[in-house]
Amino acid sequence: MRDSSTTASTKSSPLWKPFASNCCSVDDQTVFGNLSRCRPSRSEFSKNHLGPLPSFRRLSFADLSRSSSARINEDLAQTLGADLVDFQMCELKMITQSFSGNYLLGEGGFGKVYKGYVDDYLRQSLKAQPVAVKLLDIEGLQGHREWLSEVIFLGQLKHPNLVKLIGYCCEEEERVLIYEFMPRGSLENHLFRRISLSLPWATRLKIAVAAAKGLAFLHDLESPIIYRDFKTSNILLDSDFTAKLSDFGLAKMGPEGSKSHVTTRVMGTYGYAAPEYVSTGHLTTKSDVYSYGVVLLELLTGRRATEKSRPKNQQNIIDWSKPYLTSSRRLRCVMDPRLAGQYSVKAAKDTALLALQCVSPNPKDRPKMLAVVEALESLIHYKDMAVSSGHWPLSPKSQGGKVSPKVRGDHRSGRKSAPGSLRS
């Protein structure tokens, strides 16, 4: 049965709004102009035609004058209406104590993320709540294009498993995004940082289902969206460990009509990107499915997608784990030792087989995300714990005399991982 949260869009009620007629964009294949140098839009972008959501090229900061910033704000306000709050920089400085280090949550390719608090004292009608304030570093890896892409996508998409964008700020060279605050941080931190308690099996499965629902929602839109950077650091967790996808800076509209794929410059994160995308630049929703399979393997094993410090045949999680994924008795040799056998044997095996299908070298052999959701939801209630069914602890024979649970647990050595909610 289809989950209603993953099929929210219908042909009679499309989610996308067209840009205002005086606003333009740049796509990887077709040039329509850009927000700082607007030209009349094409005739097909009429009031009754919902064209594909535009993506935007990086603009030099020298081009982002007062007038261009004002035009961007005007265009976004016309397009998104009251869906997002257009914050002023002085307001953001007020709620972060001028971006004080005491309020710093993390740092990554975009810049720094600070915690703040908004309410109706700051702006009338604002819901009182903590927020995450993401401040663009003008010397960083991401820029205006990614900032604008995120505003456009998250400004129009609403789903329980997508992080909520509350507002933005565009003043001269400053680019800021304001999100709902996710108190549990990123999945990356919970899986790979020693200071975090191990996630129980039921919680891992819950996270896997919720993240799959987020991707399924994007893929099942009338005009599908390819997330393009699915990884543990972009999966954020609320107080109940409900997973939400964040960081839409690399998201892209999928193929339309008779086209089987879109061709684009290869971007994303090494270890998660699908091989056909890396080699050809051909991008489909099945590219996201591959990345999802990698994250499933991380949830099962507690290992990162790539670990250069390991022996060569163990550096890539797929190459290392694949020989163990089709047998329950062999699978236990690569299960996260922090679970200590507290996982369902059947659910773990079925999850491993699903992950193996997701990372198939042939994109056509990978399942759709709606099918992934259905498969994982059927595993939630299994109670055959490995620790009580003879599958744990590992015997020396099952280990082949090579790897002990204690040694395998050392992959979380003191090396500090990058903060969660940002692209590494």
Curated annotation (Swiss-Prot):
Its family? Belongs to the protein kinase superfamily. Ser/Thr protein kinase family.
Indicate the enzyme's highest-level EC class.
Answer: transferase
**Record localization:** Cell membrane
Q: What domain of life does the UniProt record list for this protein's source?
A: Eukaryota
**Which residues does the entry assign to the active site, renumbered to this chain?**
D229 (proton acceptor)
GO CC, sorted alphabetically, is: plasma membrane
Query: What SUPFAM superfamilies does the entry give?
Result: Protein kinase-like (PK-like)
Q: How does it assemble?
A: Interacts with the Xanthomonas campestris effector XopAC/AvrAC.
Q: What does this protein do?
A: May be involved in plant defense signaling.
Which Pfam families did the record assign? PK_Tyr_Ser-Thr
Which region ranges are annotated with the description Disordered? 390-424
Organism taxonomic ancestry = Eukaryota, Viridiplantae, Streptophyta, Embryophyta, Tracheophyta
Q: What are the Phosphotyrosine sites (modified residues) in this protein? A: Y179, Y277
Q: What is its EC number?
A: 2.7.11.1
List modified residues, type Phosphothreonine.
T264, T269
Q: Which organism is it from?
A: Arabidopsis thaliana (Mouse-ear cress)
Gene name? PBL15
Q: What's the catalysed reaction?
A: L-seryl-[protein] + ATP = O-phospho-L-seryl-[protein] + ADP + H(+); L-threonyl-[protein] + ATP = O-phospho-L-threonyl-[protein] + ADP + H(+)
Record GO biological process? defense response; regulation of lignin biosynthetic process
| Residue numbers of Phosphoserine PTMs | S233
- What Gene Ontology molecular function terms does this protein carry? ATP binding; kinase activity; protein serine kinase activity; protein serine/threonine kinase activity
Q: What's this protein's name?
A: Probable serine/threonine-protein kinase PBL15
Q: Does the keyword Transferase apply?
A: yes
List of residues binding ATP: L105, G106, E107, G108, G109, F110, G111, K112, V113, K134
Which InterPro entries does UniProt cross-reference here? Kinase-like_dom_sf, Plant_Ser_Thr_Prot_Kinase, Prot_kinase_dom, Protein_kinase_ATP_BS, Ser-Thr/Tyr_kinase_cat_dom, Ser/Thr_kinase_AS
